[in-house]
Amino acid sequence: MDFAPDPEVVVSEHADADCLPIFDAQGHPTATVQRQFANGEAINFVLKRAGQPISACFTYRNYESVWEIGGVWSDPQSRRSGFARRVVSSALATLAQQNRIPRYQVHEANLPSIQLAEALGLTRFVTMEHFLYESPTPSLR
């Protein structure tokens, strides 16, 4: 599938100040995200209405030429309107233009995000299981 940047999605190599709290709330700490942008290892994608984000994501260098698409978000009142598809498609197009390998990680319970990935033609290639050792020693827990 060929992806094209959406003309309404603002693509920037600088973190959008309106997006930082959104990404932070999703587990991407602001200081880490700002450092990724400062190092030239992140790209911001945002779709706005009336000057406010309605959907956003960012990409960041994960390993060598592999770039993660993360922080995918849409305003709760605007969900199921295709906005996330537009920002993620723009991210995929941008990474393709830069000869970077996109990776889209999603939690197994996030069905809307899984459906978005599948609708975009992405295929599942790694499924991870995590195991935890619970030490009987309290100081090692």
Residues covered by each model-derived region:
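Conserved GNAT acetyl-CoA-binding A-motif
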Residues: 95-107
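Short amphipathic alpha-helix that is part of the acyltransferase structural core
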Residues: 2-31
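Short alpha-helical
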Residues: 18, 64, 111-112
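Short Asp/Glu-rich motifs
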Residues: 113-115, 136-137
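Conserved catalytic-core motifs of GNAT/GCN5-like acyltransferases
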Residues: 123-139
